[in-house]
Amino acid sequence: MIVLDRMKISFMLEDSNDNNNNNNNNNNSNNNNNNNNNNGYCDDSSATSSPTGQDSTIDRPNSPSSSIKFTYPSKNSIVTSPSSLQLPSPSFSSSSSSSSSSSSSSLSNKDLMEDGVILLSKIASPSKSSENSPTIHTSSLSPNSYHPYQKYQKPKLHVDHYVSNNNNNNNNNNNNNKKSDYSSELYNTSPSISSKTTPNGSSTNNSPFLSPRQPLFDHSNNNNNNNNDRNENNTTKQQQQLNQLNQLNNNLNSVNNSLFDYNGNSQELQQLIPSSPTRSPSGGSGSESEENDGESSPNNMRSLACNKHSKWKKKCPESCTGRLSPVEIPIATRKLWSQEECCRLLEMVFQRDPQSVTSKESELRWRSIASTLGRTVTSTRKKYMRLMNKWSPRPHCVHPISKLIDQNEKLLLLQTSTEAQQQVQQQQINLQQFYQASQQMTQNLPPQQQQYHQQQMNQQQQLSQQLSQQLTQYKQFQQQQQQNNQQFQQHLQLQQQQLAAQAQVQHQQAQQNLQKQIQQQQKQKPQNGNTQQNNKLKNQNQNQNQNQNQNQNQNQNQNQNYNQNHNQNQNQNYNQQGSNQYLSSISSYSNNNNNNNNNNNSSNNNNNYYNNNNNNNNNNNSNNNSYYNNNNGNNNNGNNYNNNYRSSLSPPHSPHESDRQSPQQKSNNENQQNFPKFRKPIGRPAQSCEAHRNEHQKCPPLCPNRPENLNNNNNNNNNNYNNYHN
């Protein structure tokens, strides 16, 4: 009963409604028989006579191919007596089968359980030892492999039909003889619909519809069981069945150990699963099937392929003339960088520094670095950039490559230091050996020559001592010179700082005095005796300049005295250089002071002019007017012409010049700033005066306001102004 329940679970059948739709010729009695057979029971009440002698078939609509029918025996094949209860083996019948007349072997009540066990053992562990093992042929290109680039299609299932019916023995024999010629084919699963596997690779699925390329029934055993006589002894049957069970178990173990071993070779699979001739979908010849059989898995796709088949990602078949030897094409793998290579790369880059030169030279340097490392330029540059981006900010104690670099540097320093020490020691040893050899030579010589030789040796020693003393003296002299140079530079810096501070103080005092004078002059009203005041101010400025010059001369004399005292302690060459530098620096500073004083004087004079021009006098002060190269608005000629060309000297504007001007003078300056319409650029002279320019004409040569005449007058005025200030 347990076995039949397992049969029920493995062969799930549908309701009687589906059975009535597929088989219109069945009666209610047949439907009852079907239900009883599904449950695995055969009661006497269900074993009634049926008017029709047909078999009851049940469809499996969920099968992956054409409809498979599981056939059960009819009423005629069942014996009512409990001692002779028979259960024939179930069989498949295809929908395309036309004849359904066959007979099945009847079993005794004792053999019922044994046949059930044999049936389930055959379903769970089919044998491979059978000669005529049924196979499945699909419409795919290669039956032994699954191609990843091909869309999966449902395979067409071709199953030989076996119908069990309790008719005449002659018909049974004839049908068995006919069906022995056909090749039975069963469903074969592709890798996409694979059974469940354990981590070791062994299959755990016992369903007959999902076991790969395994026959559901051993037809030779079925035929033998059908051909045997019913009156044969039960003992012989049991022995045969036990032997078959042992063989099946052994075959199952060998298949599970070899078929699902993923580390095994494909040759073992081919030996265990022999390939059968395929049916091409278009009905092609056998050569096409051989080419399709030549395909392999995508992992070893091009190992045995020529140029023709490698394009289509296929293996060369045995009939291919350009078949290659079974040598795998080597895959180009990247060579990893070791720590030593990285250190060497960084050292070479730091030494050659290819990034600090032009592009061509840097390319050559990168190429030389790459050639020494045995790599390409791009790989070396990429690795260098990665190293610098990753590892430059990390500390030395963390990164191993930085540690290696430090260790290499330390080793190099130790090697260099040890090499130098070894060289010194070797020199000392050589000298000692030389002295010893010379002493031995002198001992063999006569006494007179020995004395002469010793005298020479003593002289050489004295010379060497003198040279060493001279070297020490020279080193001491150099150190003293360096110290003297440092002291002299410090003294120069101090003097320059002092002079600069004094000059700043004097400049500030002069500015304060000027501001005081300006304020006093603004408070006083302008009078007719302005010329006398101008002369007094000029004399005062001259006296101030003379006093400043005297102070500068005194400073120069002091510096010269210091230089003379300093020169006595130094060598002549060094004293000359130092004194020249010092004098040049002092002279440049004095010149700057003179220029500043001159500028101050000129500004004083001009300020006096601006203050004295507050009166509406018509006197043309040629000196100050020529400095701006213009005429006052109150000239006797009445020409308000503004000359565009100023002298090279810039006017010394005081900080608040506009505040010191009278309102009338401000208005005159505003009128003068209104330049004419057609003013030309600064680099070219005007060709006409303002009156002729308004008429768009050139000035005639006798025009008093002609620009050439005005320029000549202005040049003369500028010369007079410069002579006056000098």
UniProtKB/Swiss-Prot annotation:
Residue stretches of biased makeup (Polar residues): 45-80, 124-147, 183-209, 661-675
SUPFAM superfamilies named in the record: Homeodomain-like
Cross-referenced InterPro entries: Homeodomain-like_sf, SANT/Myb
PROSITE patterns found in the cross-reference section: MYB_LIKE
Sequence segments annotated as region (Disordered): 15-109, 124-149, 161-239, 272-303, 516-726
Chain ranges of the Myb-like domain: 329-388
Residue spans of biased composition, Low complexity class: 18-39, 81-108, 165-177, 221-239, 516-651, 709-726
Protein name as catalogued: Myb-like protein Z
